[in-house]
Amino acid sequence: MTGESGSAAPSIALNDENTMPVLGLGVAELSDDETERAVSAALEVGCRLIDTAAAYGNEAAVGRAIAASGIPRAELFVTTKLATSDQGFKGAMDACEASLERLGLDYVDLYLIHWPAPALGTYVNSFGGMIQSRGNGHARSIGVSNFTEEYLTTVIDLTFVTPAVNQIELHPLLNQEALRKTNAEHNVVTQSYTPLALGKLNDHPTVNSVAAEYGKTASQVLLRWNLQLSNAVIFRSANAEHIASDFDVFDFELAAEHMDAINALNDGTRLRPDPDTYEGS
C-alpha cells in the first residue's frame, strides 16, 4: 500500500496496473437525499472512493454529489456494479453505458458483477461483456462481487482474464480466510463490505476492550482490523460525523495480540445473502 495518512487513504495496486484507495464509502440502501449528503460528507473529509451499484437505484445521486464537489474526476475512484437482471455479454456492456449516463461520467474506475447468481449461468458471459467495456474505455478496471472460489476460478479459466477485485462480505464474524487466500493466489484484491457487521459488534466486550486501549471507537477498530488483513474496505454510513470518524483510521495500528483477539470472533455468521443460492440484485 502506498500513500499518506490523514487527508487521503493509501492506495493498493490492482493486477491491471491501476490503483485503488484502500478505504471508501458505500451507498447501499441509502435514499437519494441520504446518498448525496453521505457522498458530499465523505469527499469533504478526503475520501475518494465511492461505491454504488445499478441495483441501489442511487447512481444519479452519486453523480450529482460528485459534480457538486468540484473535485477533478482524475482524483476520484468510482465503482458501480452490474445488476443481475442485466447479466449477459451484451447486457453487461449496455448496463455499463446506462450506469455512466446516470452517474454523469465518461467512465467508471471499477465495474463489478454484483452477484454470481449461479442458477442463471450467465456470469461468465457477463464478465466477457465487461472485458469489452474495459476495452472501449467505459471501465478502467473490472471485477466481481460475492464470488466464491468456484465462480472466481471459473471466470479466470474461461475468459483468460483475472478480475482485479473480488468484493465480499467480510467482518470478524465472517473473516473469509480461505477465500482471501484464494483471491491472493490469483492476485485479486479482496475488498470487504459490511465491515462493521451491521453494528452487531459495537457492544462486544472484546472489540470495546481493544477500542478503549487505543482511544478509538468500535467502528474504527473494526475497520483497522480489516485493513490490516491487507483488504480494501467499503463502509457505509449516512451520518456525516460517523463518516469522518470511520475514515480516520490511518493514524494507529493494532498490535498482533489485538488482531488475534478480533480474529477469534470468527464463527461463520453471514449477515448478507449466500452467493451460492441468492438469485441476485
From Swiss-Prot:
Coiled coil start-end: none
Taxonomic source organism: Mycolicibacterium paratuberculosis (strain ATCC BAA-968 / K-10)
CDD domains for the chain: AKR_AKR5H1 (cd19134)
Active site (catalytic residues): Y56
Binding site for NADPH: L196, I234, R236, S237, A238, S245, R272
UniProt-listed InterPro entries: AKR (IPR020471), Aldo/ket_reductase_CS (IPR018170), NADP_OxRdtase_dom (IPR023210), NADP_OxRdtase_dom_sf (IPR036812)
Protein name stated in the entry: Aldo-keto reductase MAP_3007
Family from the record: Belongs to the aldo/keto reductase family.
Domain of life: Bacteria
Enzyme Commission number: 1.1.1.-
One Pfam family, short name: Aldo_ket_red
Keywords (A to Z) from UniProt: NADP, Oxidoreductase
Single Gene Ontology MF annotation: aldo-keto reductase (NADPH) activity
